[in-house]
Regions:
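Gram-positive cell-envelope targeting signals
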Residues: 1-77, 279
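Solvent-exposed, non-transmembrane regions of membrane-associated and secreted proteins
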Residues: 45-301
């Protein structure tokens, strides 16, 4: 009984020390409230951090599985009936996409950048019915903080149509996945091997759709405001199609006026473009870092 009373007294003393108590002076009540507020903030922050990295770890595991399906490092067996159905639905599809289409028919391609044996971008690309869903959903349709790389829904990528400018969106994830390392083309942190050094090492983008394989030469990169309150807004998303040469030339000129680095890549009306867009939180929640590429022409190195 004595031990029980002693334990009860210990808990009571702890409670009186931590929580406002009858008889406390105003200064003591303020101290306890500040302490409790800080403790709540710390606990919530820890829960959010654990949740983020736990979710990211799950997403990374899923991405590894998806990558093994596409690159053929996993043993893949598609049900013959299902395969026949997919081939009938997508008669011109490159066969390496069939296992991914079996999982999700929004799949439209695969993007790769970097060294062949250790790319810094290596992701499946989907195209949905809007530009919102895949911001926070993975390929399986489950909620995901890191989402999935996706193409702008307004210009459909089909066997018959390759948009004049394919626009892809991907998150800038703290752990370095998805489009995080695109910001290395921008030497805003004055890191060695960033900016032009990074461009010289990795000057191209490989984007294979269900129907064609393409390499793009990077020709520009820029920091973009999306809200007028933050300064000039360049509506780079409007350059999805070009009604004539003048429209194309004007769009390219505006890009080259704003780029943070310069290349010797030439452009002409009729070239297919690719645009990669990601957030760059160092400049605010509404800022974007955007990379532009031009498809390698037939017969060009």
């Amino acid at each position: 009984m004595a031990n029980f009373v002693e334990k009860e007294n210990i808990f009571l003393r702890i409670a009186k020390y931590l929580f406002p108590w009858k008889g406390d002076k105003p200064a003591e009540i303020i101290r306890k409230c500040i302490f409790l507020g800080a403790a709540v903030v710390l606990i919530v922050s820890l829960v959010m951090i654990i949740s983020f990295y736990g979710s990211t770890a799950q997403d990374n595991k899923l991405n590894e599985q998806i990558s093994s399906l596409y690159h053929g490092s996993a043993s893949v067996t598609i049900d013959p009936v299902k395969k026949d159905e997919l081939v009938k639905e997508y008669p011109e599809v490159n066969e390496e996409f069939l296992p991914l289409l079996e999982q999700n028919k929004d799949v439209i391609g695969w993007i790769t950048m970097g060294d062949e044996d250790s790319p810094f971008v290596d992701n499946v690309v989907v195209q949905g019915d809007d530009n919102e869903y895949y911001l926070d959903h993975n390929l399986n349709g489950d909620y995901s903080k890191t989402g999935t790389v996706f193409a702008d829904y307004r210009e459909k990528i089909t066997a018959e149509n390759t948009p004049a400018n394919i626009i892809l969106y991907g998150h800038n994830v703290n752990t370095g996945e998805y489009f995080a390392r695109l910001t290395r083309y921008f030497n805003y942190r004055t890191q060695l091997n960033y900016g032009m050094d990074w461009y010289r090492k990795y000057p191209t983008i490989t984007f294979n759709t269900l129907y064609r394989k393409s390499t793009y030469k990077i020709f520009a990169g820029m920091l973009v405001n999306t809200e007028e309150k933050d300064g000039e807004v360049f509506y780079y998303l409007q350059g999805r199609k070009f009604k004539n040469k003048a429209a194309f030339d004007d769009y390219v000129a505006q890009i080259l006026d704003r780029t943070t680095f310069y290349t010797d890549v030439d452009l002409k009306y009729g070239d297919n473009l690719i645009t990669l867009s990601t957030c760059i939180l160092d400049y605010g929640i509404d800022a974007r870092w955007v990379i532009f590429g031009r498809e390698v022409r037939e017969g060009e190195d």
